[in-house]
Swiss-Prot record:
Biological process according to GO: translation
GO MF term list: rRNA binding; structural constituent of ribosome
Name of the protein in question: Large ribosomal subunit protein bL9
Purpose: Binds to the 23S rRNA.
UniProt-listed NCBIfam families: L9
Signal sequence region: none
Alphabetical UniProt keywords: Ribonucleoprotein, Ribosomal protein, RNA-binding, rRNA-binding
Family membership noted in the UniProt record: Belongs to the bacterial ribosomal protein bL9 family.
Domain of life: Bacteria
SUPFAM superfamilies: L9 N-domain-like, Ribosomal protein L9 C-domain
Amino acid sequence: MTRVILVQDVNGLGSVGDVVEVKAGYSRNYLVPKGMAVRWTEGAQKHIGDISAARRAREAAALQEARDIANTLAKEAVTRELRLAANAGEDGRLFGSVTAANIAKVLSSASGHKIDRGKIEIDSPIKTLGEHTVKVKLHPNVKVDINVVVYAE
């Protein structure tokens, strides 16, 4: 049996930073060559400990920042109901659609926070005038619902 430190989550074995004992062949032929683990040494253990402590600090800071932005978005009237102008026909259908990039641009300028378009979740394409609800996923644990009102230019 060989001790290794996991540097990736491995199903059925453990998560990042765990010290596990595996058979020598599994370590030598699979885990280490694929970059999923490193051989256990005292130096490697200390290094992984430092990395995981820094990762936990970064994750805590990112979570707190996401919560602050979510509180700001929830409090501001401008971002609770975001208004977007779009070209539309007489029947209320848009020429094209409102995309996550459009929403992110307007939301960023309205709130003063940089919101990436990848954080905007639209359930179905917005192709009509009216009110639509979108989710802003600021962090895996922090989501904010925003009402988007699309009106004709």
